[in-house]
């Protein structure tokens, strides 16, 4: 690795350690020319696919946008931030597992909806109403009916 001080190509690793979070390797290096020391970090590079929008334009995948849209759908709902982070991690994993270089925004929206379905039904309906551009109350009723068919009838709890 090239020395950042003198630009010499010959450096030696003096010490290597795994970072506290386990996501990187920290290496202390020494330049054989100027004898200065510096630190480098080695991390896994994840190549998430580019997002192809409805108009055909392409943009980098940004997990912050997914988190923000999920937080908006989950606003004032009893869902922990850790659950949102875990859902986003599952979405990223699914995207990486495809091996594709691009993902259509529609597919990404479906992945978000599937995660919200498991987290909170109200948030799912909120997100679906915006994502699918509901224009009529009957569309809300259709989604609610979907849930009723998918989940078995619950017996009311005694108070």
UniProtKB/Swiss-Prot annotation:
<dbReference type="GO" id="GO:0008270">
    <property type="term" value="F:zinc ion binding"/>
</dbReference>
<dbReference type="GO" id="GO:0005524">
    <property type="term" value="F:ATP binding"/>
</dbReference>
<keyword id="KW-0805">Transcription regulation</keyword>
<keyword id="KW-0067">ATP-binding</keyword>
<dbReference type="InterPro" id="IPR055173">
    <property type="entry name" value="NrdR-like_N"/>
</dbReference>
<feature type="domain" description="ATP-cone">
    <location>
        <begin position="49"/>
        <end position="139"/>
    </location>
</feature>
<keyword id="KW-0862">Zinc</keyword>
<protein>
    <recommendedName>
        <fullName>Transcriptional repressor NrdR</fullName>
    </recommendedName>
</protein>
<keyword id="KW-0547">Nucleotide-binding</keyword>
<keyword id="KW-0804">Transcription</keyword>
<keyword id="KW-0479">Metal-binding</keyword>
<keyword id="KW-0863">Zinc-finger</keyword>
<dbReference type="GO" id="GO:0003677">
    <property type="term" value="F:DNA binding"/>
</dbReference>
<dbReference type="Pfam" id="PF22811">
    <property type="entry name" value="Zn_ribbon_NrdR"/>
</dbReference>
<keyword id="KW-0238">DNA-binding</keyword>
<dbReference type="InterPro" id="IPR003796">
    <property type="entry name" value="RNR_NrdR-like"/>
</dbReference>
<feature type="zinc finger region">
    <location>
        <begin position="3"/>
        <end position="34"/>
    </location>
</feature>
<comment type="function">
    <text>Negatively regulates transcription of bacterial ribonucleotide reductase nrd genes and operons by binding to NrdR-boxes.</text>
</comment>
<dbReference type="Pfam" id="PF03477">
    <property type="entry name" value="ATP-cone"/>
</dbReference>
<comment type="similarity">
    <text>Belongs to the NrdR family.</text>
</comment>
<keyword id="KW-0678">Repressor</keyword>
<dbReference type="InterPro" id="IPR005144">
    <property type="entry name" value="ATP-cone_dom"/>
</dbReference>
<dbReference type="GO" id="GO:0045892">
    <property type="term" value="P:negative regulation of DNA-templated transcription"/>
</dbReference>
């Amino acid at each position: 690795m090239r020395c950042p001080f003198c630009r010499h190509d010959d450096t030696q690793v003096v010490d290597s350690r795994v970072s506290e979070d386990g996501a990187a390797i920290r290496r202390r290096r020494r330049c054989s020319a100027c004898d200065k020391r510096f630190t480098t970090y080695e991390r896994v590079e994840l190549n998430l696919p580019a997002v192809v929008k409805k108009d055909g334009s392409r943009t980098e995948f940004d997990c912050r946008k997914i988190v923000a849209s999920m937080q908006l759908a989950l606003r004032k709902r009893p869902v922990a931030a850790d659950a949102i982070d875990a859902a986003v991690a599952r979405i990223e994993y699914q995207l990486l597992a495809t091996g594709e270089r691009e993902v259509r925004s529609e597919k990404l929206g479906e992945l978000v909806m599937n995660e919200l379905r498991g987290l909170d039904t109200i948030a799912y309906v909120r997100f679906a109403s915006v994502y699918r551009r509901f224009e009529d109350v009957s569309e809300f009723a259709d989604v609610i009916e979907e849930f009723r068919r998918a989940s078995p009838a619950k017996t009311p709890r005694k108070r």
